[in-house]
């Protein structure tokens, strides 16, 4: 690993938030709280909605176990991001550039940009669908309107990183409150929910169930979040001593674990509401977010249910677009040492998402959008190994991490998660290839 010579990750906000010299746990927790919520946004974005709604309406509570396992994997991987960022002062993209050859780093950068484009596509479509449902705006116009969120991001960056964190926390809280109400409206079967969290082998045996399960994995554990988190933990201005680094790792891990637990509740709630409202009323093919919106109020008998659903979807889409931009900036600067103005970076990211979205809407109609969102989540899942494996490698490398290296139990768990992710992706590819071969005329 070459000694780090380049400037810090996200230099405009690097060490911009003061950590108090206080023995108060809560004062320090408040200072460190924030990055975890920016990361949690990626776990409740519209991509999760599409996969959770499809999974709940078709298979009831069965796929709750996938949401739980995916979230536990996410908590583990995000804790490694905190460890890497605090211990080395490098984000994951910078560490990859230092460790791998230029060709390998370039390939990893391309794969990561594809993942960010897929993620942004889901967020863009989710926000556009929400605008259409709430204000009867044509989907094509909604897609174009969401590109204007670049102005919000530029304003927040000018005000300071804490303002970005505050807005995102407010939007995440909005989604959480909305789905608490939806669960109360849907009156789900608590026994069925508890059984849904138990693993079932039929998930691996049913190709359609496996496809949605891996879509949930891709929607939950997102590759760009690993790059994002390893960078934004460095916004806190802790003293560069061993003791303070351990403290930063501890509080950063608590922050992300709590935030991702909230994301687990929201993801579970989306699937539970879908299962309770659609699956058990005979509507087992509700795959479109628009259909879910239209059916919620009639089936639940609560006129506000659909509007609350739409508000939560808009909050989810808008919050996740903010973090995708930051991730794109971190990835480009880290891998290529190439910096673009944030407005230009946002515009490029948006165009990469707008073009396939508009083409799909024009060619296949507005009802194809949720299928495109689910596909984007499967693409994200296929990119995961290329971010997870380097992360586990680096945090298990004693020469790089020093005394902050993963202990044996954490290293073993991390490699197990990496193997599970690679194995599930390989299984999906084999299933898809086999299905394609069966359809080819002999």
Swiss-Prot record:
InterPro entries: NRAMP_fam. The keyword Ribosomal protein does not apply. H(+)-stimulated, divalent metal cation uptake system. The keyword Acyltransferase does not apply. GO terms for molecular function: cadmium ion transmembrane transporter activity; manganese ion transmembrane transporter activity; metal ion binding; symporter activity. It is a multi-pass membrane protein. GO terms for cellular component: plasma membrane. GO terms for biological process: iron ion transmembrane transport. This is Divalent metal cation transporter MntH. It comes from Nostoc sp. (strain PCC 7120 / SAG 25.82 / UTEX 2576). It is found in: Cell inner membrane. It comes from the Bacteria.
